[in-house]
Amino acid sequence: KATLSQKENIYLPSLAADLLEEISFEARQSEYIDEKSGVSARLSISALENLLSSAEQRLLRNNESKTTVRLSDFSSIVPAITGKVELVYEGEQEGAEFVANKLIDSAIKTLFEKNFPKIEKLEKQGANTPYDDLVTWFFNESKFEILNGISEKEYKKKLLSIEPLNKLLKEYHPEALK
């Protein structure tokens, strides 16, 4: 449960909330998780608490008054996942952390496909995709790095510097630019 301070100072984009929900769905369908034990609602609650705490730590470290939950904050929910699910033998063999990260990855992929055009494997030479400009941008950049601990202002500045990303977001997910 979010504290009053977290509610006032940390913006949780709807996409981040959807990702938390999708992680629970992925867990319920996972071959690594014991379906007899189920996936408790506590998983979502604990994951949200960890997610907000991660953002809050950054906010305090940077002496800022407001911040936004970032995708990189989702690494902080791994303990919430591993502590709230029971693994079957195959999951135990892979390891709890591996399974938790796999759930997060699968949830990201599912939401990506709901929000953006599917990434097709190119079979036709010269076929265009909505991602061509973005891929070209990254190939042409010698270095691009965003650290999770940087300030909100610097984080937005870095993301907004990727013009093909802005174009893609404007077309398919304009609320992300707000």
Label for each model-derived stretch:
Residues 1-68:
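Conserved AAA+ ATPase small/helical "lid" subdomain
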Residues 36, 56-178:
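C-terminal engagement/docking regions of AAA+ P-loop ATPases
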